[in-house]
From Swiss-Prot:
It catalyses: P(1),P(4)-bis(5'-adenosyl) tetraphosphate + H2O = 2 ADP + 2 H(+). It comes from the Bacteria. The gene is apaH. This is Bis(5'-nucleosyl)-tetraphosphatase, symmetrical. Belongs to the Ap4A hydrolase family. Its EC number is 3.6.1.41. Disulfide bonds: none annotated.
Length: 277
């Protein structure tokens, strides 16, 4: 496909900053461009419904991977999980076009690879190369797109197993895949996921490292693009790009043109206090 690719970080229901970002001359003038969204389109911000409608209307110009908040919306719609006090999903759940929006969301990928860039919401396990990541993401995608998608969502909650084994089956297998792609931040050097620690970057306890610094990570030969980690903020290395710059927390919404790493940001109003989600 032709056109520049602009990758956008976590929107989290902040439609006004998204509209401002897309109207930026550098982006709006790029008429053949395509847009990648690194997940968490919804929740915590005030306009999740407007965000979904706008991104859905982009059609084939848009590729959006599922984040943990997007999966939470699916679970809330399915009756698997009740919204919490900090959620801002009621407008979507009660919308007249909710069925269409939920069906569109169910058919989003959990991983996307193109032109040397692998996009996921949170990260990948060190043992997984690009092919493995796409294959495992595909297993979950198939379940979410199938007739029993509500039952599939019941299996995704929990922190265990914390590591990958090829012989995992059923709910354990799905849970590891979802947790790695949509929730991971820190790991042990051997690749065990750790979800209890919520500290500022660089202040994590001995024995824990960011998932992208686990030794011998199999995706280090490509660039992994992700969001999810607002306290980490903007990170640009040859092998990883983090684009969650805390839009909903009063930070910025960021877009990066992949081929030359041109960065465009818009400042955002603070809608909620950071709480590690």
């Amino acid at each position: 496909m032709k056109g520049n690719i602009w990758t956008i970080g976590d929107v989290q229901g902040c439609c006004a900053p998204l509209a401002e970002l897309l109207a930026h001359p550098e982006i709006a003038g790029d008429t053949d461009s395509r847009f990648w969204f690194a997940g968490d389109l919804v929740n915590r911000g005030p306009q999740s419904l407007a965000v979904l409608r706008r991104i859905m209307a982009m059609g084939e110009r848009c590729t959006a991977v599922l984040g943990n908040h997007d999966l939470h919306l699916l679970a809330a719609y399915a009756g698997v999980r009740k919204p919490s006090k900090s959620d801002t999903l009621d407008e979507v759940l009660q919308a007249p076009d909710a069925v269409d929006l939920i069906d569109w969301l169910r058919f989003r990928p959990l991983a996307h690879y193109e032109a040397g860039h692998l996009m996921v919401h949170a990260g990948v396990l060190a043992k997984w190369d690009v092919a493995k990541t796409l294959a495992l993401a595909g297993e979950v995608e198939q379940a979410l797109r199938g007739p029993n998608w509500r039952k599939a969502l019941q299996k995704m909650y929990g922190n265990e197993p914390a590591t990958w084994k090829d012989d995992h089956t059923g709910g354990k297998r799905m849970r590891v895949i979802i947790n790695a792609l949509t929730r991971i931040r820190l790991c042990t050097p051997s690749g065990h996921m750790e979800f209890a620690t919520k500290v500022a970057p660089g202040a994590w306890p001995a024995g824990l490292v960011p998932w992208f610094d686990v030794p011998n990570r199999a995706t280090r030969d490509v660039t992994v693009v992700f969001g999810h980690w607002s306290t980490l903020g903007l990170l640009m290395r040859p092998d990883v790009i983090c684009l969650d710059t805390g839009c909903v927390w009063g930070g910025a919404l960021s877009a990066l043109r992949l081929h030359d790493r041109k960065l465009v940001q818009v400042k955002c109003k603070r809608f909620q206090d950071p709480n590690g989600d």
